[in-house]
A protein has these predicted regions:
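A short acidic/basic microdomain associated with nuclease active sites
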Residues: 17-53
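Generic hydrophobic/packing signal
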Residues: 4, 12, 29, 48, ...
Length: 207
C-alpha cells in the first residue's frame, strides 16, 4: 500500500459517504468518514466512520498500523506516559523497569573502550523509554499491565479530552479519537475488505 499516509487516505477513499458494506450481518451505509485531528499531537483513531442501517447506526474507529510496526510509542515523554497509562504511570513504569534492573546494572556507565555501536569515551546519561509490541533488545522486558490497561493503551482511553473528542471533517465528535478497532493488514482493496479485516481492539489484545 506504500507509505503510511497514503494507506490511510486510500482506506478513507474506500469509506466515502454513501459507500455500502456488511457489518455483523447487517447492511450499512457510510454517513460520515474522516481522519480525526486535534490541536496538538494525534488521537489514537486514524480512520473514523459513522454508518447507519435501517435499524441503527455504528461508529467504527480504526487505529491503523503497518504489519511490520514494532513501536506502540517511541521516545515516550512523561506527559505522554500519563496519557497512555493514566495517573499511576510512574508506578507502572517503575515496577516494569525494576523487574529488569539487573540488565541495567550489567551495563557500563563510562566506556573506556568502544563497545558495539558505542564509541570510546562515551558516558551513559540515562535511557529512553519506548513501548513496543515485541521484545526489542537487551534492555527490554514485559510491561506489567493488566489486559484492561493494554486495551486502554491501544484505544487511547486515557488521552486528553481534545484527543478523545477530536474533530472529524470540522465537527467535534465525542470519543471519536478513542479507537475501537485495529487494522494491520495492508492488503485491502474495498470497504468490505476493511470491515472484514479489522479486529476489535479488546479481541486483538487477548490474541
Amino acid at each position: 500500500m506504500g507509505d503510511f499516509g497514503a494507506a490511510e487516505r486510500r482506506i478513507l477513499e474506500f469509506m466515502s459517504k454513501g459507500t455500502e458494506f456488511v457489518f455483523n450481518g447487517k447492511g450499512y451505509t457510510v454517513m460520515l468518514s474522516g481522519k480525526p485531528t486535534c490541536h496538538k499531537g494525534e488521537p489514537k483513531t486514524d480512520i473514523y466512520i459513522l454508518a447507519e442501517s435501517c435499524e441503527d447506526e455504528v461508529e467504527i474507529k480504526i487505529s491503523y498500523k503497518k504489519e511490520n510496526a514494532d513501536f506502540i510509542e517511541n521516545k515516550m515523554s512523561a506527559e505522554r506516559a500519563e496519557l497512555l497509562f493514566g495517573e499511576d504511570w510512574i508506578d507502572i513504569i517503575e515496577q516494569s523497569t525494576t523487574a529488569i534492573q539487573d540488565k541495567f546494572y550489567e551495563r557500563m556507565l563510562i566506556y573506556k573502550n568502544g563497545f558495539r555501536r558505542t564509541e570510546k569515551g562515551s558516558i551513559t546519561l540515562g535511557w529512553k523509554f519506548e513501548l513496543l509490541n515485541k521484545s526489542g533488545g537487551d534492555l527490554s522486558g514485559k510491561m506489567l499491565l493488566t489486559d484492561e490497561q493494554v486495551v486502554d493503551v491501544y484505544a487511547g482511553s486515557n488521552l486528553s479530552p481534545d484527543k478523545k473528542n477530536a474533530s472529524v471533517c470540522g465537527q467535534i465528535i465525542r470519543d471519536s479519537g478513542v479507537a475501537n478497532y485495529i487494522l494491520m493488514d495492508e492488503n485491502v482493496h474495498s470497504a468490505q475488505d476493511v470491515i472484514d479485516k479489522m479486529i476489535p481492539i479488546r479481541e486483538y489484545v487477548m490474541m
